[in-house]
């Protein structure tokens, strides 16, 4: 069984981490330069092949932004795994009814499946990233500083985020 992993269209996320690949002895195929955003060379992974044809893969994992052209190239009856909202699932099914589409959004939000909960993990990352982005955009000081000369009060992050959005 051949498992393929595709980069996100924006190139900043991948559906698998390099450390996870080395744990399992599976027939894994990666899209070329999938880990560029991590500054991790594909050649440093042992026993991993580059995807030559999408139609050879039995299972394909992506993050969320998969193009129609890519969907059309998939093998008949292949399994497509990703973070798809319900509209995207219907769009994929109308384009290719033979595909089995699995979305992390359809997983139950219970404590046993917490490590698979895409909503919580993505929202958590988004909150963290928005604070960093606000800090980058402002001229204020982020942390509170107490020095011999006095105190520097921290910025109000929520005001800055509101202004950016």
Question: For the regions a protein language model found, what residue spans apply to each?
Answer:
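Rossmann-like dinucleotide/phosphate-binding beta-alpha-beta segment
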Residues: 155-165
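Glycine/serine-rich phosphate-binding loop and adjoining beta1-alpha1 elements at the start
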Residues: 2, 68-154
């Amino acid at each position: 069984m051949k498992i393929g992993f595709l980069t996100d269209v924006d190139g900043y996320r991948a559906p698998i981490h390099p450390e996870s690949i080395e744990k399992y002895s599976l027939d894994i195929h990666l899209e070329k330069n999938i880990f560029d955003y991590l500054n991790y060379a594909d050649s440093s992974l042992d026993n991993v092949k580059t995807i030559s044809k999408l139609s050879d893969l039995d299972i394909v994992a992506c993050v969320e932004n998969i193009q129609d052209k890519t969907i059309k190239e998939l093998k008949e009856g292949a399994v497509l795994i990703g973070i798809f909202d319900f509209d995207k699932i219907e769009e994929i099914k109308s384009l290719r009814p033979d595909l089995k589409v699995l979305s992390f959004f359809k997983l139950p939000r219970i404590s046993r499946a917490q490590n698979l909960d895409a909503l919580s993990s993505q929202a958590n990352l988004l909150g963290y990233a928005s604070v960093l982005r606000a800090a980058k955009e402002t001229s204020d000081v982020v942390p509170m500083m107490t020095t011999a000369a006095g105190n520097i009060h921290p910025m109000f992050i929520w005001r800055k985020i509101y202004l950016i959005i």
